[in-house]
């Protein structure tokens, strides 16, 4: 199985339905024996430029390990979901489990 990093920008009005939406995507990944190595909810953030007249989006990152057919099903599901403003799927060489730079910066802001 291959490793991937997935970043989603979700419509800010859909933050309430986020758990159900991500549960559906988790099911697609784990259906064929895939694993989620890291999941981070970056929360609502300012966009660099407006997308569909929106200035904020809810960001989510997860690192997964799954077969190619599960990834194709996941990408198709993401493509046809109107709540997903942007998506990025990158193949990685290995599972990444340490906190991302975004999460580290969030921890510094809280302190």
Curated annotation (Swiss-Prot):
Pfam families the UniProt entry points to: Ribosomal_S6
Listed GO MF terms: small ribosomal subunit rRNA binding; structural constituent of ribosome
Alphabetical list of CDD domains matching this protein: bS6 (cd00473)
GO cellular component: cytosolic small ribosomal subunit
Tree of life domain: Bacteria
Coiled-coil intervals, chain numbering: none
UniProt keywords, alphabetically: Ribonucleoprotein, Ribosomal protein, RNA-binding, rRNA-binding
GO biological process terms held by the UniProt record: translation
Function: Binds together with bS18 to 16S ribosomal RNA.
Family: Belongs to the bacterial ribosomal protein bS6 family.
HAMAP family in the record: Ribosomal_bS6
Protein name: Small ribosomal subunit protein bS6
Lineage: Bacteria, Pseudomonadati, Pseudomonadota, Gammaproteobacteria, Thiotrichales
